[in-house]
C-alpha cells in the first residue's frame, strides 16, 4: 500500500529552506540589482526544474521566474510542458508508449534549451513525468536507472505543492482532484526511495500559503548556485 502524505506537510528531509528576498521589502529594481550582483557575468550552466502534480500553477510560475531573470539581464531559456505536444493520450488514459514519448521529449527539449542559454528553467523534470507512468503501469526498474542518471543533471528542484480549491479548467489536464493528489503522493514516494532519494540537487518545497512570493523564492534559491557552480554528475560522466 502506498503511503499517503499530507499536502501541507512535506517530509522535512526533502524540504531545504532557502532565504527569500521579498520584493515588498527591497523593491523590484533593488531585487534585480541583487540578482545581477550575486550572479556574475560569464557562461555557467544552471538548470532549475519545477516539479509537482498537474494543476498547481507550475506553468505560470516558470514564466514568472524567467521574467524576473530576464529583467535582471540574464540569458534564460524556458522548457515548457512537453506533454501538451504528445500525440498519445494523457492523464489517466495515458499509454506506455505515450509516457515513453513524453520522457524522451522532455530530455530532448532540455538538451536543445541548454544550447541556447546558460540558464534553463523547466516546467517539470523527468521524475514527475515518470509519476504518471508509475500510476498506470507501476515502477519500471529498467527505466529508473536511466531516469536517476538524468535527474543528476538538474541544479535545483523546486517542488510545487497542491493548493486548496478546484483544478483550473484548461481543456487539457484532468480536473479529478483525487488523481491530482495521487500523482503528488507518488512524487513524494519516489523522492524518498532509491534510486531517487540521494539526488545531488536540493529539493525545495514551496509553501502553499505563500504563493505570491514563489517566484522570488526560486530566484533567491538559484542565485547562490551559480557563484560556486560545479559540473553536474552528468557532465562528469560525459568527461570520463
Predicted feature locations:
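Hydrophobic anchor at the beta1->P-loop junction of P-loop NTPases
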Residues: 50
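Walker A (P-loop) phosphate-binding loop of P-loop NTPases
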Residues: 55
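Conserved lysine of the Walker
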Residues: 58
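Hydrophobic positions on the alpha1 helix immediately C-terminal to the Walker A/P-loop
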Residues: 61
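Conserved substrate/cofactor phosphate-moiety recognition/catalytic segment
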Residues: 67-105
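Conserved nucleotide-sensing/catalytic segment adjacent to the nucleotide-binding pocket
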Residues: 91-126
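A glycine- and Lys/Arg-enriched "phosphate-lid" helix/loop adjacent to the NTP-binding pocket
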Residues: 137-195, 199-213, 217, 230-236
Amino acid at each position: 500500500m502506498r503511503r499517503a502524505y499530507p499536502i501541507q506537510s512535506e517530509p522535512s528531509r526533502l524540504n531545504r529552506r532557502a532565504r527569500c528576498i521579498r520584493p515588498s521589502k527591497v523593491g523590484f529594481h533593488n531585487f534585480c540589482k541583487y540578482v545581477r550582483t550575486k550572479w556574475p557575468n560569464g557562461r555557467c550552466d544552471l538548470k532549475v526544474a519545477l516539479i509537482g502534480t498537474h494543476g498547481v500553477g507550475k506553468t505560470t510560475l516558470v514564466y514568472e521566474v524567467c521574467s524576473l531573470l530576464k529583467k535582471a539581464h540574464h540569458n534564460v531559456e524556458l522548457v515548457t510542458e512537453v506533454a501538451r505536444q504528445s500525440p498519445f493520450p494523457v492523464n489517466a488514459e495515458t499509454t506506455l508508449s505515450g509516457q515513453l514519448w513524453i520522457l524522451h521529449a522532455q530530455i530532448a527539449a532540455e538538451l536543445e534549451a541548454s544550447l541556447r542559454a546558460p540558464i534553463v528553467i523547466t516546467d517539470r523534470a523527468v521524475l514527475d513525468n515518470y509519476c504518471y507512468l508509475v500510476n498506470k503501469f507501476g515502477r519500471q526498474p529498467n527505466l529508473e536507472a536511466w531516469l536517476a542518471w538524468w535527474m543528476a543533471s538538474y541544479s535545483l528542484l523546486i517542488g510545487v505543492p497542491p493548493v486548496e480549491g478546484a483544478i483550473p479548467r484548461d481543456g487539457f489536464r484532468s480536473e479529478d482532484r483525487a488523481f491530482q493528489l495521487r500523482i503528488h503522493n507518488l512524487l513524494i514516494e519516489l523522492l524518498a526511495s532509491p534510486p531517487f532519494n540521494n539526488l545531488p540537487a536540493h529539493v525545495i518545497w514551496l509553501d502553499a500559503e505563500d504563493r505570491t512570493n514563489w517566484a522570488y523564492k526560486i530566484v533567491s534559491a538559484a542565485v547562490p548556485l551559480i557563484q560556486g557552480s560545479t559540473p553536474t554528475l552528468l557532465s562528469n560522466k560525459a568527461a570520463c
